[in-house]
Amino acid sequence: MKKIIITATFLLVGGLIFAQDSAKDKSAIDAQIDAIIYSWNNHNYDDLKNYTTENTDWVNVVGMWWKGRKQSQYAHQVYHNTIFKTSVGEKKSVAIRFVTKDVAIAHVEWHFYGGDTLPDGTPPRTKDNPNIDLATLVFVKQKGKWLLEAGQNVHVVPEAQQFDPVKQMPKN
């Protein structure tokens, strides 16, 4: 009986410690997401090295795939010197889950508006009618710091949401 109580105590304490670490890690990842948005809103990506790995990949909403920190920084900066130079990004929601203790996936809904007319003639979005985007971000913990390893951003098309088959999926 004593062994059962000791084992149960260790499991309970271990679970509490993991929960505390998990909350701390979620907070650290959320802070890195804020850093990404800070770069966007300041239109300066000199700080990209503070929240990405050297091998970070980014796939943007039109399928451009930037491989490594150098390409990611360069491409983001080019667009923020041109069509996004006055755009604004706002984080709306974040869902984080851990794949391992050192790998996490974050799904971020963020809204973007402002900027210049796009190359195809599309006028900039307004705060009342922003682009609604959903990003999938993969973070890895390196030397105690959470860094973006890969990200992909897609536009959410509100008109298509009614056709999501999951909305008709049986509940049981």
PLM ranges: what are they?
Residues I36, D47-K49, T56, G68, ...:
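Hydrophobic pocket/interface hotspot
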Residues M1-A23:
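Bacterial Sec-dependent N-terminal signal peptides
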Residues Y74-R125, N172:
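Surface-exposed, charged secondary-structure patches
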Residues I17-N50, E54, K167-N172:
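Short, low-complexity N-terminal intrinsically disordered segments enriched in polar/charged residues
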Residues G89, N131-I132:
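Membrane-spanning beta-strands of outer-membrane beta-barrel proteins
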Residues T52, V62, V108-F112, Q152-N153:
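A mature extracytoplasmic/lumenal domain signature
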Residues D57-K70, H80-K85:
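A short gly/proline-enriched turn/hairpin at secondary-structure junctions
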Residues D120-G121, V140-K143, L147-N172:
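Low-complexity, intrinsically disordered terminal/linker segments enriched in charged
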